[in-house]
């Protein structure tokens, strides 16, 4: 493992933090992980991200980098020698950024409505959720990974949300696998040891969701 002055402020259930753990693992970067309590944010978090006051934050040589896709690009640029995530071709790179942004703009907010919603709103959220993943299946096509033959930027941006699939399905009583078989095959291709070890067990995420629903009065 390469030794660097790298700190990751994170929360174990955060899909946005998981993608950074994956990237650092793939590139063999040694780092210090600091778990944040989102109900009682640390002085370090507030100092390092005074604008948004949220995780994840990568601190490299004392300097903070915020927003997960921005951090993901930073990691790829600084440690570009091993396991490059973004393509070298400018057009392909622009497409990878487009789909990563699509993932960020769509999945988290719709997924939250899936696990927290009720009645018609939840049913509508489920339909939107499946449509999002069918759109992603269309982009994946017959490729092994979104970028082709090698695991890349879009894969790392998306795969953390699979650890939430059990929670989505259990809370809303539906099957993602039944609706999106191609995505499940892709998910199985992501059983890279460095990827899987960077993701929490789905039941741990479900326990977190139940706790969150209780706090929000949704249980």
Curated annotation (Swiss-Prot):
InterPro entries membership: Glutathione-S-Trfase_C-like (IPR010987), Glutathione-S-Trfase_C_sf (IPR036282), Glutathione_S-Trfase_N (IPR004045), GST_C (IPR004046), GST_C_Tau (IPR045074), Omega/Tau-like (IPR045073), Thioredoxin-like_sf (IPR036249)
Residues spanning the signal sequence: none
Keywords of the record: Auxin signaling pathway, Transferase
Enzyme Commission numbers on file: 2.5.1.18
Positions with a binding annotation for glutathione: 14, 41, 55, 67-68
Enzyme class name: transferase
Residues covered by the GST C-terminal domain: 89-208
Coiled-coil residues: none
Family: Belongs to the GST superfamily. HSP26 family.
Protein name, UniProt field: Probable glutathione S-transferase MSR-1
Organism encoding this protein: Nicotiana plumbaginifolia
